[in-house]
Amino acid sequence: MILIIYAHPYPHHSHANKRMLEQAGTLENVEIRSLYHLYPDFNIDVAAEQEALSRASLIVWQHPMQWYSVPPLLKLWMDKVLTHGWAYGHGGTALHGKHLLWAVTTGGGENHFTIGSHPGFDVLSQPLQATALYCGLKWLPPFAMHCTFICDDDTLQAQARQYKQRLLAWQEVNHG
């Protein structure tokens, strides 16, 4: 099962993430958990989140990039849900062997994220990749949708279909 942990503080304003979720939602065995919908008060149900994670084979952290990082509720989710003794540390093997995909949208162009004046995705992904590896997850190459503020609908739809294809390809390789 693919579990998408979706974290967008303003989901009604996101054309890109909306299209990505629409495409992903057409696949079988996909569960989407919208953190800002489930926890508008930031009071996370840790047991429910850990149960959802335990059912998943692929975990996707999908969100808009905010200040070169994750939105605040996703960071809190990581702090609360990925606990010692469950996700890492002594006895913390609940996530071992599962895959993790970082699916991120950005307002800037892809060239904005090249080493030079701004850090590249290989640098930006390091904290998430380190978290994944620390929890025994298998890190997959990120999926990034760029220029989301200026893309026309056809471009957004095409990129959302690429996202769906990425998830479908994972399903085919990992579950025949």
Curated annotation (Swiss-Prot):
Mode of membrane association: Peripheral membrane protein
Location relative to the cell: Cell inner membrane
Cellular component annotations (GO), alphabetically ordered: plasma membrane
SUPFAM superfamilies in the record: Flavoproteins
Enzyme Commission (EC) number: 1.6.5.2
Gene Ontology annotations of biological process type: positive regulation of potassium ion transmembrane transport; potassium ion transport
Superkingdom field: Bacteria
Reported cofactor(s): FMN
UniProt catalytic activity: a quinone + NADH + H(+) = a quinol + NAD(+); a quinone + NADPH + H(+) = a quinol + NADP(+)
Role according to the record: Regulatory subunit of a potassium efflux system that confers protection against electrophiles. Required for full activity of KefC. Shows redox enzymatic activity, but this enzymatic activity is not required for activation of KefC.
Family from the record: Belongs to the NAD(P)H dehydrogenase (quinone) family. KefF subfamily.
Subunit structure: Homodimer. Interacts with KefC.
Protein's UniProt name: Glutathione-regulated potassium-efflux system ancillary protein KefF
Species this protein is from: Salmonella newport (strain SL254)
Lineage, highest ranks first: Bacteria, Pseudomonadati, Pseudomonadota, Gammaproteobacteria, Enterobacterales
